[in-house]
Structures are given as C-alpha cells and as structure tokens.
Amino acid sequence: MRRSIESVIESWATKDASRPLLIRGARRVGKTYAAEEIGRRIAGDAFIKLDFQTDLELIAPLFDCPTDDVDTIVARISDYKRTPIRKETAFILFDEVQLCERALNSLRFFSGSGWRICATGSQLGVATRKRKLPFPSGVRQETMHPMSFEEFLWALDEGQMADAVRTHAGTLETYAAHQAALSLFHR
C-alpha cells in the first residue's frame, strides 16, 4: 500500500538524514508500516526496529545513560539486537517513542551524529504535557494523516484516476470519469 509520507521518508533517508525524523499522527494511520517499508527497502539487513509499544520493559533500560551519549545508546541497541550496527548503513526506527521519555529526549542528541534515526509517535501532545525533560529540538517533524482519497485510489490501482482527479480539482473543466470517481469516494 503506497502512502504519501513514503516519499518524505525516502527523501530524508537518502538525502538529508542529518536530523532524526519524527513522524507524528493519530494511532493506526500507518506510521510504523510506512517507516518500516522504507527502512527495510533502503537498509535491508541493517534495518533496526525498537518497538516501545510491545517491548518497553526490555528497551527502556537501553536509554539509562546520559541521553547525549548516542554512541553508548547505539552500542546498547547493538547488544540488545545481537547484531553489529554501522553508521553508514543503519536505519534505526524508534516505534511509539513517546512511551519512553529518555528515548524521546535522546533524539535531539542524534542530530548531526551521522546516525539515521526515524521515530514514530502517536499521542505526542498528551505525552509531552507529562514530561520532565524538554521536547527534543533539532528533530525534523512530519505529520501523517489517515488515508487520503488519492492514497485510496493508489491502493485500488487507480493511479491514472488519482492523477486526473488531482489535475481537475483546481480547474472548472469537466472530468470524464467524475461519476466513477464519486462512486469510489462514497465506497
């Protein structure tokens, strides 16, 4: 399933990963799916995922060190995953990072470190009100929304219709497949 955010993640990962990428959005909109898809495609076996939702008790201690010591954090992640992690190839995903305040805080120290760190978070606004540490600066933030009509058309393999709807949306021209598009919209 193709999502618009994927091009943002891919561009960040291949051209400008100097700052960690934090993908915000409501629960269950596909943040993890999109980040994993791109991470696995770009990094292959060097893709590392830390899932704070399911493994919080195991992962949180990895951040029980100064949060500005990113090399120690990565070394601990490497030990936890039992795999070497190389800066040049790794794509590290912190999934549902808001559940671990120290992990969320560490993001700002990964900025400029050379590590490619992507994080996802839902309910970040709620989580940040309860925080003892400041919200991380130096992090690129993107918001992911529920599936758009264009993404819905892509999922149905209706790419040509998606392009035509986008083209005609800003004009007063009639669209030959308007009824078909409307029918899909109401589906």
PLM regions: where:
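Conserved P-loop NTPase "ATPase switch" module shared by AAA+ and STAND
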Residues: 84-103
